[in-house]
């Protein structure tokens, strides 16, 4: 993929996210910063344009007023599919059951959806370790364990090894 096109789409996604992102104090973490870091990680590790954009937009349906229709119009059905797989089902009220269902949905959607989720959790691990927030690190540990309990053997992308190594630092 042409670097110029990636740059244009990256900026388009970032601008859209900025336009719809609520004020930082209404969110549990600096979500915009997190979403950009996930996209940058995917870019620096030579993932496809759709994965880079899905990484930037992975929290858009949960944390902004961006609609599925707008996401599809701007970035296509594949990006929407990955973002939807990475979005919590608000009808499931049990916290950990919600996370197990989300991971199962990502797996069912395919390795690309799990790559974005693994990158999301890897970034959260790094962020919360810098904050020394044990509660948030415990969340990262818990969801990583769910990932590795469910991850199919044929999902072999490097991000899974990277996340497993990060998990081993805390287990």
Regions found by a protein language model. Name each.
Residues 1-171:
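Active-site helical microenvironments for divalent-metal-assisted chemistry
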